[in-house]
Amino acid sequence: MSKFWNERVKKLEPYVPGEQPKDQKYIKLNTNENPYPPSPMVIEAIKKEADYKLKLYPDPNCDSLKRTIAEYYGISDKEVFVGNGSDEVLAFSFMTFFSPRKTVFFADITYSFYKVYANLLNLNCELIPLKEDFSLDLDNFCRCNGGVIIPNPNAPTAKYIGLSDIKKILDWNKDSVVIIDEAYIDFGGESAVKFIKDYKNLLIVQTLSKSRSLAGLRIGFAMGSPELIEGLSRVKNSINSYTLDRLAIVGAEAAFKDKEYFEDARRKIIATRERVSTELKQIGFKVIESKANFIFISHTTISAESIFNELRKRGILVRYFKTARIDNFLRVSIGTDKEMSEFMDKIKECIA
C-alpha cells in the first residue's frame, strides 16, 4: 500500500473482471461475451471511418448515435445518453443521482461493480437479500431510500423481473431515481423503455457488449427523461467530453441498423441456452431459469469449485464466485452450438 494513496483509495476493493487469457487454448464461457462476430455492416463502417478523419476529435455529444438509438427505441434523442461502455454510464449515474445523505438500495447478489461504485463515492448502501430462489424481494425495495438499482435480468443469477414488478417499484419510488440495468435484456426479456414517458425518475442503462457483439469497442447508453440525461451530461463533461471515439460511434450506429443480423444471432443464443439448460438438468444440475446469454448452475452432489477447476484443466473457462449464498454455483456464458457441445462433453467428464 503506497504512502501516496489518499485514504479513500486505501479503503477501496476494486472490481475484479473475469479472466482474459492471453492465449487461445480455452473456450471462454466466463465473461458473457457474444460468441458470434459483429455484423459485417459494423466492420465495413469502421473500415470506412479509419482514414484521415482520425486526426480529428469525435463529436463530443455523439448526436448521430443518439438519433440512431432514439429512432430504434421510439424515443427522443434528448432522452438518450451514451458513454464508454455501460460501466462508465453506471459510474456517471451513481455520481449524478445518489448522495451520501440517503441510502441506495440494491440486492445482495447482483453485479458486484455497484458496491465498488458506492464505496468509491462514499455512498451509504443497503444490500437487500434476494429470496431463497434468487427472486427479488419486491416489498423491501418499496421503502424510503435515496435511489434503487436493479439489473434485469440479474447478474449473475440470470433471473428476470416482469414489467409489472418494475412498475410497482417505480410507483413507490417517485422521489428517487430507479436505475434498471438492462445489459442482458435482449435475450428474452422485455425492456422497461416504454415507461420512460410516464416516470421521470426511471433511467435505463444498456450496452452493445452483449447482444451486439461489441465488447471490444466499449459502448453503453442510458435512456431516461431529459432532466436525467442532462444531469449525466453535466457529470460526463466535468470528467471527459470525448468518451466515444470515431470508430466506436460509427460501429454502434451500424450495429443498430443491421436488425436482421442482430435478430439471427439473438435467436441462436437463446436456442442454444435452452438446449444446454435441458441437457444439464438431465445430468443432475439445477439450472436457474435464464433470460440472459448465460446460465447459473449448481450440481446436486459435486461442488461448484471442483467443477470449475476440472473444467479449466480441460480448457473450458466459466465463472465461479467464492461468495456467500452462491459459492456452489457456476455462471456459464452461452457460446456457439459447437462450443456448448464441447462444454457438455467436458462437464460430463467432471461429474463422472
Swiss-Prot record:
GO terms for biological process: L-histidine biosynthetic process. One of its GO terms (molecular function) is pyridoxal phosphate binding. The modification N6-(pyridoxal phosphate)lysine is found at K210. Its cofactor is pyridoxal 5'-phosphate. HAMAP family: HisC_aminotrans_2. Pfam families: Aminotran_1_2 (PF00155). It comes from Clostridium acetobutylicum (strain ATCC 824 / DSM 792 / JCM 1419 / IAM 19013 / LMG 5710 / NBRC 13948 / NRRL B-527 / VKM B-1787 / 2291 / W). It catalyses: L-histidinol phosphate + 2-oxoglutarate = 3-(imidazol-4-yl)-2-oxopropyl phosphate + L-glutamate. The keyword Membrane does not apply. Its EC number is 2.6.1.9. Pathway: Amino-acid biosynthesis; L-histidine biosynthesis; L-histidine from 5-phospho-alpha-D-ribose 1-diphosphate: step 7/9. Homodimer. Keywords: Amino-acid biosynthesis, Aminotransferase, Histidine biosynthesis, Pyridoxal phosphate, Transferase. This is Histidinol-phosphate aminotransferase. It comes from the Bacteria. Belongs to the class-II pyridoxal-phosphate-dependent aminotransferase family. Histidinol-phosphate aminotransferase subfamily. PROSITE patterns: AA_TRANSFER_CLASS_2. InterPro entries: Aminotrans_II_pyridoxalP_BS (IPR001917), Aminotransferase_I/II_large (IPR004839), HisP_aminotrans (IPR005861), HistidinolP_aminotransfase (IPR050106), PyrdxlP-dep_Trfase (IPR015424), PyrdxlP-dep_Trfase_major (IPR015421), PyrdxlP-dep_Trfase_small (IPR015422).
